[in-house]
Amino acid sequence: MNGDNRPVEDAHYTETGFPYAATGSYMDFYGGAAQGPLNYDHAATMHPQDNLYWTMNTNAYKFGFSGSDNASFYGSYDMNDHLSRMSIGRTNWDYHPMVNVADDPENTVARSVQIGDTDEHSEAEECIANEHDPDSPQVSWQDDIDPDTMTYEELVELGEAVGTESRGLSQELIETLPTKKYKFGSIFSRKRAGERCVICQLKYKIGERQMNLPCKHVYHSECISKWLSINKVCPVCNSEVFGEPSIH
């Protein structure tokens, strides 16, 4: 009570959630008629669905979605999409702008190339380590191979399996060796009737081509050609065909 014996009224301010001034906002909102906000003191408690509907309507007007002039620019889908991203009870500044973080295609390709280079480098290091490892099975297998102690069949199988190595003679050198046809009919040839090719262990037949080595040993031309392409020594005396003869 004051000196005039009149009751002092407390002023209460209500947060309406509208960005406009109180007088202007109500006039614009209700079509130009100045009207105060309705008193909801005696209204029943609003259900969550009703509260959501009221918030959507007020926010729609707040963000400029209402009105016939804005209908062509903002449809109901845009308004609902915008409001669905907002949570009731949170202010606008609580929402951070969404940034679409996408990998740059150039960065993706660079990472793929880097991963590929790392894998290739690891494989290369592993191969080098195996080559220098004396306990490697491959190294042991290669050390156990001695073409000088292998039979013709073993050399042929080895050549077909791993390919011929340049320990033998070239085809041009082999073709320079003298050849002749085997003949049977004379006295001297009868004495050699039981001769066989040491390589294939088959008897010579009339008309078959024979090849004479510098060491005077004779073989089937086909058999000795295959042998010399793998090993350049004579199968009998181990003398090099185009080198110094071995002394036994």
From Swiss-Prot:
Per the record, the zinc finger regions (RING-type) lie at: 197-238
Phenotype on disruption: Enlarged floral organs (e.g. petals and sepals) and thick stems mainly due to altered numbers of normally sized cells. Enhanced da1-1 phenotype leading to increased seed and organ size.
Reaction(s) this enzyme catalyzes, per UniProt: S-ubiquitinyl-[E2 ubiquitin-conjugating enzyme]-L-cysteine + [acceptor protein]-L-lysine = [E2 ubiquitin-conjugating enzyme]-L-cysteine + N(6)-ubiquitinyl-[acceptor protein]-L-lysine
The known PTMs are summarized as: Auto-ubiquitinated.
- Tissue specificity: Mostly expressed in inflorescence, and, to a lower extent, in seedlings, roots, stems, leaves and siliques.
User: Does the keyword Zinc feature in the UniProt annotation?
Assistant: yes
Q: Which SMART domains match?
A: RING
EC number(s) recorded for this UniProt protein: 2.3.2.27
Q: Name one GO molecular function term.
A: zinc ion binding
Cited InterPro entries: BB (IPR033276), BB-like_RING-H2 (IPR048217), Znf_RING (IPR001841), Znf_RING/FYVE/PHD (IPR013083)
Pathway recorded for this protein: Protein modification; protein ubiquitination
Q: Which GO terms describe its biological process?
A: floral organ development; negative regulation of cell population proliferation; negative regulation of organ growth; positive regulation of leaf senescence; protein autoubiquitination; protein ubiquitination
Q: Does the keyword Cytoplasm apply?
A: no
Signal sequence region:
none
Q: Which UniProt keywords apply?
A: Developmental protein, Metal-binding, Transferase, Ubl conjugation, Ubl conjugation pathway, Zinc, Zinc-finger
Q: Name the Gene3D superfamilies on file.
A: Zinc/RING finger domain, C3HC4 (zinc finger) (3.30.40.10)
Pfam families listed in its UniProt record: zf-RING_2 (PF13639)
| Inducing or repressing factors | Rapid turn-over by proteasome-mediated degradation (at protein level).
| Primary role | E3 ubiquitin-protein ligase that limits organ size, and possibly seed size, in a dose-dependent manner. Negatively regulates the duration of cell proliferation in leaves and petals independently of the major phytohormones (e.g. auxin, cytokinin, gibberellin, brassinosteroids, ethylene, abscisic acid, jasmonic acid), probably by targeting growth stimulators for degradation. Limits the proliferation of root meristematic cells. Polyubiquitinates DA1. Involved in the promotion of leaf senescence, in addition to its function in restricting plant growth.
Q: Which PANTHER family match?
A: RING-TYPE DOMAIN-CONTAINING PROTEIN (PTHR46400:SF5), RING/U-BOX SUPERFAMILY PROTEIN (PTHR46400)
Query: What more does the record tell us?
Result: Plants overexpressing BB exhibit early senescence.
Name it.
E3 ubiquitin-protein ligase BIG BROTHER
Task: Give the classification, highest ranks.
Answer: Eukaryota, Viridiplantae, Streptophyta, Embryophyta, Tracheophyta
